[in-house]
């Protein structure tokens, strides 16, 4: 599951759990982006903070793992590089699924090396409340759209709540709330 995870929240975790169950996945690997190219003009928390929040959030689920592949590579993060690295690590016999939000999937036609991206993994677009995605332009054999239990939580809203001094309890895992407070993330 790729994402900025700034911060990771319960919606990410529910989506990963639902997809793992529906597709019979042995594990879900969370891959926090290093330098997200789509957000080059937006402030993004340091990669190490986003990685550690993801580790904290996923620690209690034995099916969840966290990879540093994008963070350790350096430079802008492109999905093609992530998939090539994961393919090299896991081998050709392992089927890769790339879980992402439907909002990100809507922009997939602008992604680098798109044809190879679809050769390396099956994409699962998780729908969010209030977001509709037409899959007419997406290759049906390599893309699935999945509805998960509605959780109207976004990382953008979580950051805004912290900057306004509002609580994050139950929107993100408890350990992530504590990490954000300790590191003073998202405060003005």
Swiss-Prot record:
InterPro entries reported for this sequence: Cyt_trans-like, NadD/NMNAT, Rossmann-like_a/b/a_fold
Give the enzyme's main class according to its UniProt record, as a single word.
transferase
Gene that this polypeptide is encoded by: nadD
Official protein name in the record: Probable nicotinate-nucleotide adenylyltransferase
Q: Name one GO molecular function term.
A: ATP binding
Pathway given for this chain reads: Cofactor biosynthesis; NAD(+) biosynthesis; deamido-NAD(+) from nicotinate D-ribonucleotide: step 1/1
Q: Which Pfam families match?
A: CTP_transf_like
Q: Taxonomic lineage of this organism? A: Bacteria, Bacillati, Actinomycetota, Actinomycetes, Micromonosporales
User: What is this protein's function per UniProt?
Assistant: Catalyzes the reversible adenylation of nicotinate mononucleotide (NaMN) to nicotinic acid adenine dinucleotide (NaAD).
Reactions mediated catalytically: nicotinate beta-D-ribonucleotide + ATP + H(+) = deamido-NAD(+) + diphosphate
Instruction: List its EC numbers.
Output: 2.7.7.18
């Amino acid at each position: 599951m790729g994402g900025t995870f700034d911060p990771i929240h319960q919606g990410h975790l529910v989506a990963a759990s639902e997809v793992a169950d529906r597709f019979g996945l042995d594990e879900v690997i969370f891959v926090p982006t290093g330098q997200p190219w789509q957000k080059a003009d937006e402030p993004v928390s340091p990669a190490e903070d986003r990685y550690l929040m993801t580790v904290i959030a996923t620690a209690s689920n034995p099916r969840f793992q966290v990879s540093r592949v994008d963070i350790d590579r350096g430079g802008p993060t492109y999905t093609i590089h992530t998939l090539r690295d994961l393919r090299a690590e896991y081998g050709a016999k392992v089927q890769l699924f790339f879980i992402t939000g439907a909002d990100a999937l809507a922009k997939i036609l602008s992604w680098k090396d798109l044809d190879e991206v679809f050769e390396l993994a099956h994409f699962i677009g998780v729908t969010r409340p209030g977001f509709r995605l037409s899959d007419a332009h997406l290759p049906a054999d390599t893309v699935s759209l999945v509805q998960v239990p509605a959780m109207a939580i976004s990382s953008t809203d979580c950051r805004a709540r912290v900057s306004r001094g509002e609580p994050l309890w139950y929107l993100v895992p408890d350990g992530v709330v504590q990490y954000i407070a300790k590191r003073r993330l998202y405060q003005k």
